[in-house]
Amino acid sequence: MKFYLYLSILLILLTSTSFGDIWSNCGPNEKFKITSVSIVPDPPVKGKLITISGSGVLGENLTSGQVAILVKFGLITLINEKKDICTLPGSPYKCPIKEGEYSHTINFTIPEAAPNGKYTGHVSVTDQESSEIACIDVTLTL
């Protein structure tokens, strides 16, 4: 299950135009603008350490909100959950989150046992007024 948590984080961070072949913006009004994303190695390789770094600018203060994550392997739903943005496990940021620049780096290994195939994800982030801050659709093949 830890792999799927990391995959969810990967889906959130893969929002740079350099990864335009695997992600698309599904929201009309992005209040969180990604300024850079890097992933090493690119593409990710099972059994190898992956480093993902991302930074962006939050355009409004957040006092609360949610992250909704849907991850599928083919037709099989792996993750379908909503998390409180203020208490995300492993996040260094706690509410209130002030507008401004943010960056974060994660390191993890995709297990060798992860099945090959097509993974899809949908991530939607909303603020304290249930307004969408960011929305991303991702397709990744291992």
UniProtKB/Swiss-Prot annotation:
Signal peptide: 1-20
A GO biological process held by the record: sterol transport
Keywords: Lipid transport, Signal, Transport
GO molecular function, one term: sterol binding
Keyword Ribonucleoprotein: no
Function: Catalyzes the intermembrane transfer of phosphatidylglycerol and phosphatidylinositol.
Quaternary structure (record): Monomer.
Family: Belongs to the NPC2 family.
Protein name per the record: Putative phosphatidylglycerol/phosphatidylinositol transfer protein 2
Organism: Dictyostelium discoideum (Social amoeba)
